[in-house]
Amino acid sequence: MPWQGVEETIAMRKFKSFLGGLGLVMLLAVGLVVWARLPPVAVGVLLLALVLWLLLTRRGRQTLSVAGVGISTLGQRLGASSVIVIGIAGVVGVLVAMLAMGEGFQATLQQTGSDDTAIVLRGGSNAELNSVLERDNLSVIAQAPGVARGANGKPVASAEISVVANLPKKSDPTADANVQIRGVGDEAWTLRPNVKIVQGRRFKPGLRELVVGQGALRQFVGLEVGQQLRLAGQQWTVVGVFAANDSHDSELWGDMQTVASAYRRGSSAQSVTVRLTSPQAFDTFKAALSSDPRLKVDVSTTREYYTKQSEGLTRVIRVVGITVGTIMAIGAIFGALNTMFAAIAARAREIATLRAIGFRGVPVVVAVLLETMLLALLGGVLGGFVTWLIFNGYTASTLGSNFSQVVFQFRVSPQLLWTGLKWAMAIGFIGGLFPAVRAARLPVTTALRES
């Protein structure tokens, strides 16, 4: 039964090939997880080890020889090589742009808070918009231990109210968007020393006057100094523009009592922001309010509060960015696989000849990977540079936790560019690995016959 033995041999070879492929995929998956977590220092160590291996070992020098031949022919395969470069550039560009949006939004809100100021909301409130603090509670909060006092001896505390109004956007005057109006007390300026009037003047208490943030001025129609606005059925005058370089740039500020009266909020407030004597005084302040039976409030530092406000949207943007990037990366991997399989097929005789004269499989595999990852590196650098050029500092707006527009800038940080490069190199590695392994495993006689 010779044929039965042949069939068993063929089946065994196929099974071994399947197991080898499965093992390769599993190793690849583990490698990608490790690669995603590697810090720049570890990547630098790996790169140094690769360079030393290429320069100081026999197989390394063989790898350089094979890689040099392949890289020298890239110009002859310009169209196919461009598919890899442009595909990976697209992946990196989309990924970095999406992550830059999330990082910019998060940075804007995190800059709003500090560790030496605290915000008090009604217990169980996630944001100012659904918080209410009665008038009797306001003085209790302001007089709590740990609250700093100003030169006049009064607590540095600002009871505030936050309401939402609709204004036409400059990008589309026919469409309205939400803008946050914040009613603040006299101490609001002391609490937030970064808020500076850059045009006009501050509002006067008791008058229907507003100062607007630079971000809101850029986004909405009719907020120039001297303009009249109709809000809550009343005429308001814009008397100044302020710069805060945080989320307050998206707001309109007015006198707390005047805003509360216009929107029929009575004598209540929605939040109280205080300056602490020191960041260490926060625990004392929080403990005093938590133990007071007259109060049922949530207390947090303003840094903690605004960081929490950014977490939800930042998480969504990150998930969407990684999902879209992954889908595009799969397409780029198939493009790289197709290109490199074609390149290997065209060079089958050359690779077979090298192996026949003593070149082992490892130099062939590494050489093909070096060629693919060089193209991937070019694509990653191109995608990162174009994204930085277009999106870094780009101004956008989105709905914040108070259902009002928050103006922020995209932030293409070095960390995001590094993430994009790691994605590019991972795509190049996957796209080159399987063609490289095939080239190394293909029997010399078969390669010579096929070519």
Regions found by a protein language model. Name each.
Residues P168-D176, V221, V225-T237, V241-G321:
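Mechanotransmission and gating elements of multispan inner-membrane complexes involved in transport
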Residues L78-F105, T314-E350, M373-L382, I430:
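Hydrophobic alpha-helical transmembrane segments of multi-pass inner-membrane transport and secretion
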Residues F341, R349-T395, T419-I427, P435:
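Transmembrane alpha-helical interface segments in multi-pass membrane proteins
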